[in-house]
From Swiss-Prot:
Protein name: Large ribosomal subunit protein eL34
Subcellular location(s) of the protein: Cytoplasm, Cytosol; Cytoplasm; Endoplasmic reticulum
UniProtKB keywords: Acetylation, Cytoplasm, Endoplasmic reticulum, Isopeptide bond, Phosphoprotein, Ribonucleoprotein, Ribosomal protein, Ubl conjugation
Cross-link (Glycyl lysine isopeptide (Lys-Gly) (interchain with G-Cter in SUMO2)): 108
Modified residues (N6-acetyllysine): 36, 43
Subunit structure: Component of the large ribosomal subunit.
GO CC terms: cytoplasm; cytosol; cytosolic large ribosomal subunit; endoplasmic reticulum; mitochondrion; nucleolus; postsynapse; presynapse
Protein source organism: Mus musculus
An example Gene Ontology biological process: translation at presynapse
The keyword Iron is assigned to this record: no
């Protein structure tokens, strides 16, 4: 005969916080074990990249609070908040903007020297 199972806690509804799995005890009984909710790794701060960040533990917020800093970020600029590709693009963009400013400054200086002649 099939063994009937009952929840071990008071909540009797099949909600997200009441998910269970079956487990066989050493006494050969089948009982419910409550499963923890699955964590998600953070998304990139750029908002463009679809995936989750690599190198950051995918855990629930309460567990994240207890983790060490090395498990919550990667050792890079914007590590733990932006993905590597976006950081690379941001650095390139900043470099090109600075180069453009220098070019404008040089062109102004040349125009100034042309007027002085």
């Amino acid at each position: 005969m099939v063994q009937r199972l009952t929840y071990r806690r008071r909540l009797s509804y099949n909600t997200a916080s009441n998910k269970t799995r079956l487990s066989r005890t050493p006494g050969n009984r089948i009982v419910y074990l409550y499963t923890k909710k699955v964590g998600k790794a953070p998304k990139s701060a750029c908002g463009v990249c679809p995936g989750r960040l690599r190198g950051v533990r995918a855990v629930r917020p309460k567990v994240l609070m207890r983790l060490s800093k090395t498990q919550k970020h990667v050792s890079r600029a914007y590590g733990g908040s932006m993905c590597a590709k976006c950081v690379r693009d941001r650095i390139k963009r900043a470099f090109l903007i600075e180069e453009q400013k220098i070019v404008v400054k040089v062109l102004k200086a040349q125009a100034q020297s042309q007027k002085a002649k």
